[in-house]
């Protein structure tokens, strides 16, 4: 297992998803360009899935299929899974998180499982509030922190704080919202634009 890089876009949307539903478990998928052997796995985007129907397999299948098709159109693969437990002091992956991450790893062996650390999930955390796990055989184990890269951690951290202050998380749409009202955009293009506009002036371009 090589390096993994987490983009601002992927990190920010994951945090906003957890912030929108602070008393619920939430989960989602990471997308990445398929890396060649030995290349860094770059998680460029994430798709928030559920906040109330996490264990319903039919809805999960629908979501996985739609995200897979949508990602493929942009040359991306489902390369990881994130999960935040409802309990503030629980950062351990439960049976559901392990099952979904395992399913993704069947198709993409280098997939990562990221658990959000709710105790560190504050507007501007000093260190990334995540635990990155990799698949080793039948077990998910913490990935070497030296192999976890951030496109720009300082910028990502500040961006989450600013967007929370602007209440941007209230505009985030997960698959639950979309299934309740199919007019709602689970790809979050409006929010993506808001994030990339923030990144652009800092980096000189619109890439997250």
From Swiss-Prot:
PROSITE patterns: MPN. The keyword Cell division does not apply. Pfam families: UPF0172 (PF03665). One of its GO terms (cellular component) is endoplasmic reticulum membrane. The keyword Transferase does not apply. Residues 4-139 form the MPN domain. Keywords: Endoplasmic reticulum, Membrane. It comes from the Eukaryota. It is found in: Endoplasmic reticulum membrane. CDD domains: MPN_UPF0172. Signal peptide: none annotated. It is a peripheral membrane protein. One of its GO terms (biological process) is protein insertion into ER membrane by stop-transfer membrane-anchor sequence. PANTHER family: ER MEMBRANE PROTEIN COMPLEX, ER MEMBRANE PROTEIN COMPLEX SUBUNIT 9. Part of the endoplasmic reticulum membrane protein complex (EMC) that enables the energy-independent insertion into endoplasmic reticulum membranes of newly synthesized membrane proteins. Preferentially accommodates proteins with transmembrane domains that are weakly hydrophobic or contain destabilizing features such as charged and aromatic residues. Involved in the cotranslational insertion of multi-pass membrane proteins in which stop-transfer membrane-anchor sequences become ER membrane spanning helices. Belongs to the EMC8/EMC9 family. Component of the ER membrane protein complex (EMC). EMC8 and EMC9 are mutually exclusive subunits of the EMC complex. This is ER membrane protein complex subunit 9. The lineage of its organism: Eukaryota, Metazoa, Chordata, Craniata, Vertebrata.
């Amino acid at each position: 297992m090589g390096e993994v890089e987490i983009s601002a876009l992927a990190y920010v949307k994951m945090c906003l998803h957890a912030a929108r539903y602070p008393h619920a478990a939430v989960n989602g998928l990471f997308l990445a360009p398929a890396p060649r052997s030995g290349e860094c796995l770059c998680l460029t985007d994430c798709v928030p899935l559920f906040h109330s129907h996490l264990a319903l397999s039919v809805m999960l299948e629908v979501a996985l299929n739609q995200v897979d098709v949508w990602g493929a159109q942009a040359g991306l693969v489902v390369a990881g899974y994130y999960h935040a437990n409802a309990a503030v002091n629980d950062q351990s992956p439960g049976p559901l998180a392990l099952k979904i991450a395992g399913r993704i790893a069947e198709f993409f062996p280098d997939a990562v499982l990221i658990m959000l650390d709710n105790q560190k999930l504050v507007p501007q955390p000093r260190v990334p509030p995540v635990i990155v796990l990799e698949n080793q055989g039948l077990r998910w184990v913490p990935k070497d922190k030296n192999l976890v890269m951030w496109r720009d951690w300082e910028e990502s951290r500040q961006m989450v704080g600013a967007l929370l202050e602007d209440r941007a998380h209230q505009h985030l749409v997960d698959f639950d919202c979309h299934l309740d009202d199919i007019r709602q955009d689970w790809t979050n293009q409006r929010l993506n634009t808001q994030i990339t506009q923030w990144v652009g002036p800092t980096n000189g371009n619109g890439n997250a």
